[in-house]
A protein has these predicted regions:
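An extended, acidic, His-containing surface patch that forms the Zn2+-binding/catalytic region
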Residues: 78, 209-210, 265-326, 330-334, ...
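Histidine/acidic-residue-rich, glycine-tolerant segments that coordinate divalent metal ions
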Residues: 165-246
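N-terminal helical capping/dimerization or prosegment-like subdomains
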Residues: 27-122, 334, 338
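Active-site metal-coordination/substrate-binding segment of hydrolases
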Residues: 105-173, 455
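Short, Lys/Arg-enriched N-terminal segments with co-localized hydrophobic residues
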Residues: 18-27
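A short core secondary-structure module
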Residues: 186, 242-264
Length: 475
């Protein structure tokens, strides 16, 4: 193992039994109480962060992202973190705060991000997107859950320990996750020594419900592209030439339809399929959570978890053609679409994009010319969630939530997890979060369930205690 691969205290996790006392259960009760005590101030801090329109994808609001980074740095300083840095490698500002590990104790890296998605159509929000508003036990606003609540979770857990947890804690708050983390790999390389840890907690996922926590054990990857179809060198009168000469939009529609079979399964050859966790996901839950209209059926074959977490998915997310209000009786010469593909755990995003490209190039109807422009790639990730660190996490969930956590997959992508795994191959990675099925992250009326915030913060505080005190913890 090279020096770059060695966590700061990997031996400490292996020999903790000889160095640290067993958990004091009475102390754990005190810790739960202290989380409740700090939550009101943490919520105020969260609301202040939500009021900052930290949308890195909007160049006009990039100064707000810098203001958000300054606010996060101050919160970390006020909580008792030292060695606070605002860092950048040509992209958005990220914030790092460190609390050194006691002798023999492991170091835990806590990740979140302070940038948010654009808010979309203001008229579709029930309250202003950047003015946090509570309704029915939920806090509404852009970033309340994704992922400024991740920052709040870390702050609450750290403050509950009085700023002196029994482990080293490094908080890393990224500023461009919603834009695909384009400079993260450079940040990890530049800050490798600063960010090195034995355990990495990524608080950017969701939970099974508001009453049942999840430990995310797999995520699909992402590959996208733009396909352009051309049939003519100029538009033609549809009355004079329609029925003889193909138009590009009709060719594009037929090409896109070839991506799925009649049951909605992906019909592209050469794609990988994994095996999903054995979790009960009844159809009525799916309909309730997605807003599927009456009479509209599901697509694909296999269980819901298998289709959501372990099979590839292809979605057409945009089409460029003549808008209806500017349409005329013309055969359209060119049309294009953007295609997003989810890659099952164990697959390779680049290979899947190549397979999709081959399909598009070989299935064009009527000899239409097809040009495929590759886009973003993000690798899938599967976590081997076994061993003492994961046992400690499940115990912390169980104590904080009062029920067993669900090992769940996520159909979406967090590509940077693979980057963390590559940068710190010996670290154990835990993917947690504060979202729930009603959160509506990335959509209008995003919200945070305040009870989930309390339980997530409590679980993280308990986890820090267990990692620092339980003689059973070992890598």
């Amino acid at each position: 193992m090279s020096a770059r691969d060695t966590p700061p205290n990997c031996a400490s996790l292996r020999t903790l039994a000889a160095r640290r006392r067993p958990i004091n259960l009475e102390g754990m009760d005190d810790l739960v109480r202290r989380v409740r005590e700090v939550l009101p101030s943490v919520r105020r801090d969260l609301e202040d962060l939500v009021r900052i329109e930290s949308v890195w994808a909007d160049p006009a609001r990039r100064p707000e992202v810098h203001r958000s980074a300054d606010a996060v740095a101050k919160l970390l300083s006020d909580a008792g973190f030292g060695d606070i840095q605002i860092v950048s490698e040509g992209g958005a500002p990220a914030v790092i705060g460190r609390h050194p590990a006691p002798p023999g104790a492991p170091t835990v890296l806590l990740y979140a991000h302070h940038d948010v998605q654009p808010e979309g159509d203001h008229t579709q929000w029930h309250s202003p997107p950047f003015e946090p508003t509570e309704r029915d036990g939920r806090l509404y606003g852009r970033g309340t859950a994704d992922d400024k609540a991740g920052i709040a979770t870390h702050l609450a857990a750290f403050r509950a320990h009085g700023g002196k947890p029994p482990v080293g804690v490094t908080v890393f708050v990224e500023g461009e996750e919603e834009s695909g983390s384009p400079s993260l790999s450079k940040l990890l390389a530049a800050q490798r020594e600063t960010l090195a840890a034995d355990v990495i907690v990524i608080a950017d996922s969701d939970n099974w419900s508001t009453d049942v926590p999840s430990l995310t054990v797999s995520l699909r990857g992402l590959a996208d592209c733009v396909v352009e179809v051309a049939t003519l060198d100029h538009g033609l009168h549809s009355g004079l030439w329609g029925g003889v000469v193909p138009d590009a939009l009709s060719a594009l529609v037929r090409l896109l339809a070839s991506l799925h079979d009649d049951d909605g399964n992906v019909a592209v050859a050469g794609l990988h399929e994994a095996t999903a966790a054995d979790v009960d996901y009844p159809p009525e839950r799916l309909r309730r959570e997605t807003g599927l209209l009456d009479g509209v059926s599901e697509i694909g074959s296999g269980s819901v978890p298998q289709r959501l977490w372990a099979k590839p998915a292809i979605t057409v997310i945009g089409i460029d053609t003549t808008p209806i209000d500017k349409s005329s009786n013309t055969l359209i010469p060119r049309a294009r679409a953007k295609i997003s593909m989810r890659v099952a755990p164990g697959g390779d995003a680049a290979e899947h994009l190549a397979a999709l490209t081959r399909h598009l190039e070989t299935h064009a109807p009527w000899g239409a010319r097809v040009t495929v422009t590759p886009g973003d790639l993000g690798q899938p990730y599967r976590i081997d969630a076994t061993g003492p660190v994961y046992d400690a996490a499940r115990a912390a969930f169980r104590e904080a939530w009062g029920t067993e956590p669900v090992d769940a997959g996520v159909g979406g992508s967090i590509p940077f997890i693979a980057e963390f795994a590559e940068a710190f191959p010996s670290a154990k990675i835990l993917v947690t979060g504060v979202e729930d099925p009603a959160t509506q992250a990335h959509s209008v009326n995003e919200s945070l369930h305040l009870g989930v915030l309390e339980r997530a913060a409590t679980a993280e505080a308990l986890l820090l205690a267990k990692l620092g005190s339980d003689g059973k913890i070992a890598t």
